[in-house]
Amino acid sequence: MTIALGKFTKDEKDLFDIMDDWLRRDRFVFVGWSGLLLFPCAYFALGGWFTGTTFVTSWYTHGLASSYLEGCNFLTAAVSTPANSLSHSLLLLWGPEAQGDFTRWCQLGGLWTFVALHGAFGLIGFMLRQFELARSVQLRPYNAIAFSGPIAVFVSVFLIYPLGQSGWFFAPSFGVAAIFRFILFFQGFHNWTLNPFHMMGVAGVLGAALLCAIHGATVENTLFEDGDGANTFRAFNPTQAEETYSMVTANRFWSQIFGVAFSNKRWLHFFMLFVPVTGLWMSALGVVGLALNLRAYDFVSQEIRAAEDPEFETFYTKNILLNEGIRAWMAAQDQPHENLIFPEEVLPRGNAL
């Protein structure tokens, strides 16, 4: 018996093939299948943010002015979170809260959920775009893997944290000063700076900045003299096939400086990928812990001794008192719907005050 093996070919293209040909066509701006998610979501997220910061007040949700129309500037304008009473409602325009009224929807904070959800899916679409392009040109997918770090931070801070709390109200509003307020809130209510996951995140981000600076400077230092131009950009032909810097020279230099150095480019560049991405993932995990109100380090023995001994105080006990002050002041300011009043005699005073 003879078996003929051959590649099956379709006589005519179906709708999927036609779509695939159009989406993945070589053009100035690649679209791709990921673009069906990325471009609409990015458009709506940015459009919602510009609309909110320009026109929409936060008076009904936070008792604040938050738009250019009310006199805010770029640093103080924001798309603010919905009121605490709305809990975790998706605040759909056609939902029971707004009932199709666009003005009412904006007043209730519907733009925040709109921007947050479209922003999250837009970021995921951008990561899928990197996967798709990498596969098209037969590259490894490390760019997309690296971009998972920012996505993890965004999703944990803007979605998972408020889901663990009483409502979207406790998520960050989309604005510069609003993010600063959220950072102060995290410190006062969660002692975030003493959280080991935050420490790993800081080490990752600052360590990555250091590695980036060292790497860029080292490459510039060991460039081959390939031309007589006045600067790096004029002296080199960007299409030349050979390397433009000496890994051997760089290795000898850092071996003398530190006693150790990267021996090959793969390990060096993997380390530059690993440090920031791991840091971002660790801080995202820490925020998930805070969503569940998990505590980090509590040095109770120092707190007890500071309470008993007027002359004993550490930077830790000082910070604990500062956190109490943030909570006492911030709760009344930040949650006006609770009508909280703290008389001066209950506000914290350290031993040194």
Curated annotation (Swiss-Prot):
Signal peptide: none annotated. One of its GO terms (cellular component) is chloroplast thylakoid membrane. Photosystem II (PSII) is a light-driven water:plastoquinone oxidoreductase that uses light energy to abstract electrons from H(2)O, generating O(2) and a proton gradient subsequently used for ATP formation. It consists of a core antenna complex that captures photons, and an electron transfer chain that converts photonic excitation into a charge separation. The D1/D2 (PsbA/PsbD) reaction center heterodimer binds P680, the primary electron donor of PSII as well as several subsequent electron acceptors. D2 is needed for assembly of a stable PSII complex. It is found in: Plastid, Chloroplast thylakoid membrane. The modification N-acetylthreonine is found at T2. Its main location: plastid. The modification Phosphothreonine is found at T2. The D1/D2 heterodimer binds P680, chlorophylls that are the primary electron donor of PSII, and subsequent electron acceptors. It shares a non-heme iron and each subunit binds pheophytin, quinone, additional chlorophylls, carotenoids and lipids. There is also a Cl(-1) ion associated with D1 and D2, which is required for oxygen evolution. The PSII complex binds additional chlorophylls, carotenoids and specific lipids. InterPro entries: D1/D2 (IPR055266), Photo_II_D1/D2_sf (IPR036854), Photo_RC_L/M (IPR000484), Photo_RC_L/M_CS (IPR055265), PSII_PsbD/D2 (IPR005868). A plastoquinone binds at H215, F262. It comes from Phaseolus vulgaris. One of its GO terms (biological process) is photosynthetic electron transport in photosystem II. Its EC number is 1.10.3.9. The lineage of its organism: Eukaryota, Viridiplantae, Streptophyta, Embryophyta, Tracheophyta. Fe cation binds at H215, H269. It is a multi-pass membrane protein. This is Photosystem II D2 protein. GO terms for molecular function: chlorophyll binding; electron transporter, transferring electrons within the cyclic electron transport pathway of photosynthesis activity; iron ion binding; oxygen evolving activity. Pheophytin a binds at Q130, N143. Chlorophyll a ChlzD2 binds at H118. Chlorophyll a PD2 binds at H198. Belongs to the reaction center PufL/M/PsbA/D family. Keywords: Acetylation, Chlorophyll, Chloroplast, Chromophore, Electron transport, Iron, Magnesium, Membrane, Metal-binding, Oxidoreductase, Phosphoprotein, Photosynthesis, Photosystem II, Plastid, Thylakoid, Transmembrane, Transmembrane helix, Transport. PROSITE patterns: REACTION_CENTER (PS00244).
